[in-house]
Amino acid sequence: MRSLLALMLLPLAGFGQQELPDPLQAGWKGKKVCEVLVENESVRTLRCTFPPGIGHEKHYHPKHVGYTLKGGTFRITDAKGTREVNIPEGYTFYNEEVPWHEVLNIGSDTAVFLIVEPKD
């Protein structure tokens, strides 16, 4: 019986993520925080800007590389909980995928990131 239930629920795995916006679609209180710099058949590159008190509402990320043009202090909430992090200028990161998170710039400076999403 458990096997049958597991098979019936399998198509719903990941359903919530598909309902979430991607980084370009997500914004903050109805306003965009990311803009497309480059998009072609191989890659999409976004610049995301977060003045103090501005965040990025709950969204998912496909595989991506990020680079911090201007650092800042953020409150990040994801499946692991909520934490505050200082992201320095020049910080580079890679994620295979981020099922969901939301962020808020709690610092006093505007932070700017490049997000590069390869299209496989």
Model-derived features: positions:
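N-terminal low-complexity, Pro/Thr/Ser-rich intrinsically disordered segments
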Residues: 18-30
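Bacterial Sec-dependent N-terminal signal peptides
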Residues: 1-18
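A short glycine-rich, His/Asp/Glu-containing loop-to-beta-strand
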Residues: 27-57, 63-66, 116
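Short beta-strand segments in beta-sandwich/barrel cores
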Residues: 55-56, 72-76, 92
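Glycine- and acidic-residue-biased ligand/ion/polar-headgroup-sensing regions
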Residues: 61-80
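Short acidic-glycine-tyrosine-enriched beta hairpin
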Residues: 81-98
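His-enriched metal-coordination microenvironments in redox/metal-binding proteins
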Residues: 57-62, 101, 105
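Ligand-binding loop in jelly-roll beta-barrel domains
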Residues: 71, 98-119
